[in-house]
Amino acid sequence: MKYQLTVMEARVIGCLLEKQVTTPEQYPLSVNGVVTACNQKTNREPVMNLSESEVQEQLDNLVKRHYLRTVSGFGNRVTKYEQRFCNSEFGDLKLSAAEVALITTLLLRGAQTPGELRSRAARMYEFSDMAEVESTLEQLANREDGPFVVRLAREPGKRESRYMHLFSGEVENPPAVTDMSNAADGDLQARVEALEIEVAELKQRLDSLLAHLGD
């Protein structure tokens, strides 16, 4: 595939895509903002602990590959970064809002079921029903310039198959592990996680507002 990202590059791109939609007032992001987003404990799998130098290296590489661009001047005291991975003026990759939400959530959390994706992507795009989630996944799997996602074999005890993005290469289906937890439990967990993410974002916005008022 034309688009190939390392694990850390996928995390950086996913974070910028997420923040562009969920916290536009804080976007583009500084290096520190990207570090914080990459190391979030909510809506991240796996949880990472990247250093500023590690993140800066990824940012530099992605700028060279034209997946990001720097923004400076016009009142910005520090260099900030915005994504050019998709939907940029001169880029080839064009995605709908629904597709961006699913791709972002897959970049940030890895393989997930349609039910998990619907709950976890809700802050970026509100799917009307599960049929819309599944049809969007199928579109991503069958695009002429793709495929961008793949459906994995259903695990024993699971009602839904998981999907994974293909921006980091082909995916090997992991060995099936017998797990009798049902889809309802998975959906409940996903809803709880979505609420935790919303609380964390609200706290971040409050801290930013208080810091601004203190200036």
Swiss-Prot record:
Keywords annotated in UniProt: Acetylation
InterPro entries named among the record's database cross-references: DUF480, WH-like_DNA-bd_sf, WH_DNA-bd_sf
Residue numbers of N6-acetyllysine PTMs: K80
NCBIfam families associated with the record: PRK11239.1 (NF008413)
Family: Belongs to the UPF0502 family.
PANTHER family for this protein: UPF0502 PROTEIN YCEH
Designated name of the protein: UPF0502 protein YceH
Gene designation: yceH
